[in-house]
């Protein structure tokens, strides 16, 4: 198992290129199951979750060819089975995204429940209700979702009680081959969903209301779609993370290959804290702040402040003057990084879903443990400003969603080494 060793308080300067968005790539990879013709997907990030989804597609019978490290050609013309097994699904919760396309195209599928998933307690029930609204029969048998619609799916209204990004994506993909019109009410509005809509539209699916909370889909009454090649949008969370690298180290950094309006909640907050930003068409440059002020954040669905940036801003709060407050409204157990930041010297108190951070605090290098993907990046941010050497363990979480993070940070002047645990 690998860990990162980070020398703190090293000056940073330069630019970084943002990779394709993992959270856009995953549903688009799943959507290729709807296509009867070959599709080329460009700007795929080389991260563990993408490799896991590619392996799942291959296991279902899709033929895959990597044309270069970030371009994949996929043909799902002759899939030979429709069972997504536990061995593959347990590696990644987003594997549930194959449910909608498999059911829509083949009228029956078996998809393992994602690991540790209790029906009712986790959002998987939103996916199942959406499929049932389109006429599917759903049974849970021996840890598998058995879904079937012998006469095909039929368009209907799908109302999400709670906004769900992957739930919206699964419903969109299923509706694309359903007979008639489907309305998704209380749909998620993330840019990743907008790109999935564009991909489905390239195959002839009519979708109204793209980017809004109500989507109207007229299904294509064929056995499959003819999807076109696509380039994955830049990763707004990776971009936000590198903006935080600049912010926490108070460095001048340029973040390239981005879509600035996808980052507005993040850039607005950085300006409020005291940073100057030069926002161009596809880049943002962050300049050192004379004074970094404490702030308040409440996580919300897009276009609100993203829950996936909450951990990074908690690390940043340790270097801001005054008391910062972060309220997490979307997920439980999303403050697991707080106790690890405390090991570095952060002054953080927790009360249910609210974290209070007192700053500015001098952090000291230590051994810390990543608990999830975004927590791992928060610990790296804190280690960059800590006095001495820090070691971040369990970075397999990091590798799920950040492409070559240590290479990109080292190119800015940092001293980060990937080493093997003894």
From Swiss-Prot:
GO terms for biological process: cell division; cell wall organization; peptidoglycan biosynthetic process; regulation of cell shape; UDP-N-acetylgalactosamine biosynthetic process. The modification 2-(S-cysteinyl)pyruvic acid O-phosphothioketal is found at residue 117. InterPro entries: Enolpyruvate_Tfrase_dom, Enolpyruvate_Tfrase_sf, MurA_subfamily, RNA3'P_cycl/enolpyr_Trfase_a/b, UDP_GlcNAc_COvinyl_MurA. The active site is at 117 (proton donor). GO terms for cellular component: cytoplasm. UDP-N-acetyl-alpha-D-glucosamine binds at residues 93, 122-126, 308, 330. Keywords: Cell cycle, Cell division, Cell shape, Cell wall biogenesis/degradation, Cytoplasm, Peptidoglycan synthesis, Pyruvate, Transferase. Phosphoenolpyruvate binds at residues 22-23. The keyword Nucleus does not apply. The keyword Transferase applies. It catalyses: phosphoenolpyruvate + UDP-N-acetyl-alpha-D-glucosamine = UDP-N-acetyl-3-O-(1-carboxyvinyl)-alpha-D-glucosamine + phosphate. One of its GO terms (molecular function) is UDP-N-acetylglucosamine 1-carboxyvinyltransferase activity. It is found in: Cytoplasm. Gene3D superfamilies: Enolpyruvate transferase domain. Its EC number is 2.5.1.7. Pathway: Cell wall biogenesis; peptidoglycan biosynthesis. Cell wall formation. Adds enolpyruvyl to UDP-N-acetylglucosamine. Belongs to the EPSP synthase family. MurA subfamily. HAMAP family: MurA. PANTHER family: UDP-N-ACETYLGLUCOSAMINE 1-CARBOXYVINYLTRANSFERASE. This is UDP-N-acetylglucosamine 1-carboxyvinyltransferase. It comes from Helicobacter pylori (strain Shi470). The gene is murA.
